[in-house]
Amino acid sequence: MDFSDKRLSYEKGALHEEILPQEPFAMLKQWLNEAIEQNVPEPYAISLATCGSDNMPAVRTVLVREVTELGVVFYTNYLSHKGQDIEQNPHAEALFFWHDMQRQVRVRGVIAKVDRAKTEAYFQKRPYESQVGAWVSQPQSGEVASREAMDEIFANLKQKFPEGDTVPTPEFWGGYEIAATEIEFWQGRANRLHDRLLYSRASTQDTWQITRLLP
């Protein structure tokens, strides 16, 4: 397939330095709220890129569950491909992309596990079948003989953990936080002269610097 003649002019907004707060998380929350108001489906979804010791990058979609004062939090299986990558190399990058708003946000930083109490509290907020489903993936991305075999594992786990009882949080499952050292806000503009404003800092203890980047 050839898409070389396809074009879309980006003319829905602009991004100026003078409107930016001193730290990026207020701006990220503002853009998330605007995406929610415009009914963007799952605006808290990110593409998460990791790279383990094999130097082979991997990317997948995960859901952000919290924006903190340091970065963004998501939950997953620690034994998954992404969990193994993070164990070997804690540097990662996340991308929010809101196509209808012609906006994206890149979040780069260092990933660490959230404390266990935070994981436990979030797990108990999940729907019952999502809690049970977390137990099925041992490990996530592991091979299974068939869909029927997976459904049977799920049914057996529902008997083991009846609805109404507390489903224990798997030890192999929990939260990660990307502590950001760079956050770039991108707003599409006409003629491909996009607005790119980058917040950066050497560590989470430093103040943010704001730089405009060429498109």
Curated annotation (Swiss-Prot):
Its cofactor is FMN. One of its GO terms (biological process) is pyridoxine biosynthetic process. Substrate binds at residues 7-10, 65, 122, 126, 130, 192-194. Binds 1 FMN per subunit. Its EC number is 1.4.3.5. Pathway: Cofactor metabolism; pyridoxal 5'-phosphate salvage; pyridoxal 5'-phosphate from pyridoxamine 5'-phosphate: step 1/1; Cofactor metabolism; pyridoxal 5'-phosphate salvage; pyridoxal 5'-phosphate from pyridoxine 5'-phosphate: step 1/1. Pfam families: PNP_phzG_C, PNPOx_N. Keywords: Flavoprotein, FMN, Oxidoreductase, Pyridoxine biosynthesis. GO terms for molecular function: FMN binding; pyridoxamine phosphate oxidase activity. It comes from the Bacteria. FMN binds at residues 60-65, 75-76, 82, 104, 140-141, 186, 196. Gene3D superfamilies: Electron Transport, Fmn-binding Protein, Chain A (2.30.110.10). It catalyses: pyridoxamine 5'-phosphate + O2 + H2O = pyridoxal 5'-phosphate + H2O2 + NH4(+); pyridoxine 5'-phosphate + O2 = pyridoxal 5'-phosphate + H2O2. Catalyzes the oxidation of either pyridoxine 5'-phosphate (PNP) or pyridoxamine 5'-phosphate (PMP) into pyridoxal 5'-phosphate (PLP). Homodimer. Belongs to the pyridoxamine 5'-phosphate oxidase family. This is Pyridoxine/pyridoxamine 5'-phosphate oxidase. The gene is pdxH.
